[in-house]
């Protein structure tokens, strides 16, 4: 088989298409946003490839795998097992880091456990073995008469029942052993659980400390060391919590006797109690109630709400503050900022041991007086946060929590012992904090000698390979300790791609979703090289992509179209690029051949030096004290290679500051900065991202854009409705009354199938129409509410032409190019690009003040050349109303049409974080140091 044959694919909007795809080639699927590319690549080819592979497993194994729906297709042959690498958001687990996802951290743990050199944390000297005499002297230096026992560790944290071990010890004449911390008789040992980890230490000797024990102790120690293979523990018999003495014939600090357990990989894992920092449990950060978040506005008084929930509206807590004010002689009506530092301290952190007289009045007006210390607002919040069982209280209090690096482990996540093991004078945390490019250099230059070199050889090869793949997909600026939560979709996808190349599989079908997202043109070539490498191993690589270079690099291009949604779903052209360019109906072909192109604007809007937004001293992540100047009322692009600090500057600094000052938000905490000027030119800030407009099937474009309410009002105003007394609520499928109760207005019923994917069957009461029969009897211009929800935006625009409020909102959806989606289409079925355009349409339909600051992060994700043209028209329209638009973007077609560009760099990670140049595209294109300039110049 050298081809994959698809016959009769009808998934989503595909129109019964037939295709022959060559195997072991690089195939690019392209077309307008919403034309059916993902339906073909993911929901048909990948879903069927995965399903067939999973069907071959046992029913028991299948229930643990999330199965995809069986695609609606007549026949596919020539498929291989499929692996998809999607844009889906990364892990939200705070324990995942770049190092753990790529498995590099696992190999580093192994390396440090096998060839690391432990040192004493206090004296920084390598640990050396202790002799029996040293051990005896140490024990005899304990207070005389202290009852101690000498233990030999036999089994450390291993699963099993260990019956044989316990029988052997008893037969050797030992009477007691300490099992999982409890001392018990070996004649009647407890039954151990097979699946739990156990620790068994045999009691070799029990004694009271006195001077004439030297000979006896020396013999006991020799026995213990022989039994355990070189370690012994001395424990206090009277106080099980007392610190135990650890002895090692292997290594210990000669100065203070600090010794550590044998090095094992789990000592270097922050996800294992053996290695995690005990203070922060291996998270690297500690949560605390932040006074700056609790006191949002120091100009308010305590009575007026300086501390939310403690003002005069909250009677109970306000009584406490009044009693406190009487005791410390301060005024609850005075602004918080004017009160003394001592008052601040007492209110926030409590009165310590000092008793204060509190007057409490209950609902009936009875007063009681009690004397007790005041716990402090922050301690009160901490206590309520720990004790509460209500998720609402927890969520409310979580708004006041900030994170700070853990003081014990300084944010490295590891316990003290693990931080003091070195390979060539470098501890593990130092390697985790290196960028991937830097780490690769370190391992290339690492020279180990003798036996250690032999042990480390294989481990180093694995680490080196993985680092190389990450560098090849353009991620050399990330550090291994970077938390997975902070990665962008494109970065996470490329990390998964790098792990796949590391796996080195052959004969697999890879399906990728726009791997070039968030990647600067400079890094694009390396990414394409990686995809070609995957193909050359003998895999079929199918990529959904709009990037010009990717389309040119493909062996076979499939153009889906001609339009989007109901107007798409057909194969417009397929074959090598030349064949695509020759088809006049193919939009992709026309843009690729240059017959159509996005024009450079004839004239740009000039900047007004009087009106600027100026952010000074931004220092978040890798930013180096940056000063950003944005002209007000212009369309500005923020550019720079991946990792240069664009998102930190705009999403983590500018947006939260503006959100706090313009929208009055309290949650967003901006990255460190010195000052901001010029926000008076704006009345609000809006971030338009690609996150879904709703996470449930009940959200849809009609509810999100506010079209649904006037539609329901129209239906409620029909004479028949008025006669029956129907209100607009009758026409909502979210509340009782008008909806079909059998499916609760969903239109489908979910049937759980345990070994198969859950299936959704149309509700047999309403036949999938979501409403009950009576509601569907009401018609407006001959259509029922269900038929209206089933219209495309284009049809609805025509249908409601006479209703100006609706026509205007629907027209904006048309303007952003969403002519084809249905009014009632579930939000979960919209692509990221579509969701973003629904949000844009909602903004356009508002009566604008022309003073809004819009922030967009890579709006061209998922957009075809023709879609980008539409997006630019919308953004230019918003700008022409006087609004300011700031876009983070790599797409050169967008960059060349901007009025102003701010370019960050020169490199990613620690090599970036500076503003190289800002000005018009023509100015920026002349900058020698800028990578963006190199690619932008030919476009102008």
UniProtKB/Swiss-Prot annotation:
Entries under HAMAP family matching the protein: UvrA
Subcellular location as annotated: Cytoplasm
GO (cellular component) term, any one: excinuclease repair complex
Phenotype upon gene inactivation: Significantly reduced survival of cells expressing DNA ADP-ribosyl transferase (darT) mutant G49D.
Sorted UniProt keywords: ATP-binding, Cytoplasm, DNA damage, DNA excision, DNA repair, DNA-binding, Excision nuclease, Metal-binding, Nucleotide-binding, Repeat, SOS response, Zinc, Zinc-finger
InterPro entries: ABC_transporter-like_ATP-bd (IPR003439), ABC_transporter-like_CS (IPR017871), ATP_grasp_subdomain_1 (IPR013815), P-loop_NTPase (IPR027417), UvrA (IPR004602), UvrA_DNA-bd (IPR041552), UvrA_inter (IPR041102)
Assembly with partners or alone: Forms a heterotetramer with UvrB during the search for lesions.
Pfam annotation, one family: ABC_tran
Function: The UvrABC repair system catalyzes the recognition and processing of DNA lesions. UvrA is an ATPase and a DNA-binding protein. A damage recognition complex composed of 2 UvrA and 2 UvrB subunits scans DNA for abnormalities. When the presence of a lesion has been verified by UvrB, the UvrA molecules dissociate. Plays a role in recovery after DNA ADP-ribosylation.
Family classification: Belongs to the ABC transporter superfamily. UvrA family.
Domain ABC transporter: 310-587, 607-937
Molecular functions (GO terms): ATP binding; ATP hydrolysis activity; DNA binding; excinuclease ABC activity; zinc ion binding
Zinc finger map (C4-type): 253-280, 740-766
Keyword rRNA-binding among UniProt keywords: no
Protein name (database record): UvrABC system protein A
Organism annotation: Escherichia coli O127:H6 (strain E2348/69 / EPEC)
GO biological process assignments: nucleotide-excision repair; SOS response
Sites where the protein binds ATP: 31-38, 640-647
């Amino acid at each position: 088989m050298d081809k994959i044959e698809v016959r009769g694919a009808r998934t989503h909007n595909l129109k019964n298409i037939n295709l022959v795809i060559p195997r072991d080639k690089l195939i690019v699927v392209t077309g307008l946003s919403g034309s059916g590319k993902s339906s073909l690549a993911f929901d048909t080819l990948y879903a069927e490839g995965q399903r067939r592979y999973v069907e071959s497993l046992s029913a028991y194994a299948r229930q643990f795998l999330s199965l995809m729906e069986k695609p609606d297709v007549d026949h596919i042959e020539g498929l291989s097992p499929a692996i998809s690498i999607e844009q889906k958001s990364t892990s939200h687990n705070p324990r995942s880091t770049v190092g753990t996802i790529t498995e590099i951290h696992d190999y580093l743990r192994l390396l440090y456990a096998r060839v690391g050199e432990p040192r004493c944390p206090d004296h920084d000297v390598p640990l050396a073995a202790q002799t029996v005499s040293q051990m005896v002297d140490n024990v005899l230096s304990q207070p005389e008469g202290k009852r101690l026992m000498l233990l030999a560790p036999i089994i450390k944290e291993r699963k099993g029942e260990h019956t044989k071990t316990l029988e052997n010890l008893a037969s050797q004449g030992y009477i007691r052993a300490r099992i999982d911390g409890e001392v018990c008789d070996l004649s009647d040992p407890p039954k151990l659980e097979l699946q739990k980890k156990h620790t068994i230490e045999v009691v070799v000797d029990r004694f009271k400390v006195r001077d004439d024990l030297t000979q006896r102790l020396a013999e006991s120690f020799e026995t213990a060391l022989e039994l355990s293979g070189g370690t012994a523990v001395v424990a206090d018999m009277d106080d099980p919590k007392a610190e135990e003495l650890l002895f090692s014939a292997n290594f210990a600090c000669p100065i203070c006797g600090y010794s550590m357990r044998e090095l094992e990989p789990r000592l270097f894992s922050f996800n294992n109690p053996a290695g995690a920092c005990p203070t922060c449990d291996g998270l690297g950060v500690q949560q605390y109630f932040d006074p700056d978040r609790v006191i949002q506005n120091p100009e308010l008084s305590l009575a007026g709400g300086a501390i939310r929930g403690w003002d005069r509206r909250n009677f109970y807590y306000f009584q406490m503050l009044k009693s406190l004010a009487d005791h410390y002689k301060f005024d609850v009506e005075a602004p918080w900022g004017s009160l003394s530092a001592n008052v601040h301290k007492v209110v926030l952190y409590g009165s310590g041991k000092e008793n204060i007289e509190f007057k409490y009045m209950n609902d009936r007006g009875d007063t009681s007086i009690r004397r007790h210390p005041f716990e402090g607002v922050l301690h009160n919040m901490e206590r309520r946060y720990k004790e509460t069982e209500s998720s609402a209280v927890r969520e409310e209090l979580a708004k006041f929590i900030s994170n700070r690096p853990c003081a014990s482990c300084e944010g490295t996540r590891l316990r003290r012992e693990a931080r003091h093991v070195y390979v060539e004078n470098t501890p593990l945390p130092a390697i985790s904090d290196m960028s991937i490019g830097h780490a690769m250099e370190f391992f290339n230059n690492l020279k180990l000698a003798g036996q250690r070199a032999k042990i480390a050889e294989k481990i180093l090869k694995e680490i080196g390979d993985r680092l190389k793949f990450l560098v090849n997909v353009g991620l050399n600026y990330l550090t291994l300790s970077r938390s997975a939560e902070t990665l962008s979709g494109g970065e996470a996808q490329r990390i998964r791609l790098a792990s796949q190349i590391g796996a080195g599989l052959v004969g697999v079908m890879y399906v990728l979703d726009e791997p070039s997202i968030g990647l600067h043109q400079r890094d694009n070539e390396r990414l394409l090289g990686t995809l070609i490498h995957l193909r050359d191993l003998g895999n079929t690589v199918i990529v959904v992509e709009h990037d010009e270079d990717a389309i040119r690099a493909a062996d076979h291009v499939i153009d889906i179209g001609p339009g989007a949604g109901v107007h798409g779903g057909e194969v417009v052209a397929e074959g090598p690029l030349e064949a695509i360019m020759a088809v006049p109906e193919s939009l992709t072909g026309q843009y690729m051949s240059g017959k159509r192109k996005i024009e450079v604007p004839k004239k740009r809007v000039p900047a007004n030096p009087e009106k600027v937004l100026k952010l000074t001293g931004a220092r978040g992540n890798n930013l180096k004290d940056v000063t950003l100047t944005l002209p007000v009322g212009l369309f500005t692009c923020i550019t720079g290679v991946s990792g240069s600090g664009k998102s930190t500057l705009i999403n983590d600094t500018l947006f939260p500051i503006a959100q706090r000052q313009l929208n009055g938000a309290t949650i967003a905490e901006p990255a460190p900065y010195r000052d901001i000027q010029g926000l008076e030119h704006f009345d609000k800030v809006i971030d338009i991202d690609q996150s879904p407009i709703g996470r449930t099937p009940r959200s849809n474009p009609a509810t999100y854009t506010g079209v649904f309410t006037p539609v329901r009002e129209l239906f409620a105003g029909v004479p028949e409705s008025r006669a029956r007394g129907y209100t607009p609520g009758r026409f909502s499928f979210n509340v009782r009354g008008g909806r079909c109760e059998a499916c609760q207005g969903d239109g489908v019923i979910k049937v759980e199938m345990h070994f198969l994917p859950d299936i959704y069957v149309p509700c047999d009461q309403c036949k999938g129409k979501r409403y009950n029969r009576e509601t569907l009897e009401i018609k407006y211009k001959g259509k029922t509410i269900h038929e209206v929800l089933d219209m495309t935006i284009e049809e609805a625009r025509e249908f409601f032409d006479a209703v100006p409020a609706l026509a205007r909102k629907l027209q904006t959806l048309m303007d952003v190019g969403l002519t084809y989606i249905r009014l009632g289409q579930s939000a979960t079925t919209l692509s990221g690009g579509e969701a973003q355009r629904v949000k844009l349409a909602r903004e356009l339909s508002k009566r604008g003040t022309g003073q809004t600051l819009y922030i967009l992060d890579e709006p061209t994700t998922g957009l075809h050349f023709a879609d980008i043209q539409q997006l630019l028209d919308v953004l230019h329209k918003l700008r022409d109303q006087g609004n300011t638009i700031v876009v983070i973007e790599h797409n050169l077609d967008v960059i060349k049409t901007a009025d102003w560009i701010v370019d960050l760099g020169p490199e990613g990670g620690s090599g970036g974080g500076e503003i190289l140049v800002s000005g018009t595209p023509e100015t920026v294109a002349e900058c020698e140091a800028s990578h963006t300039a190199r690619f932008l110049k030919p476009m102008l």
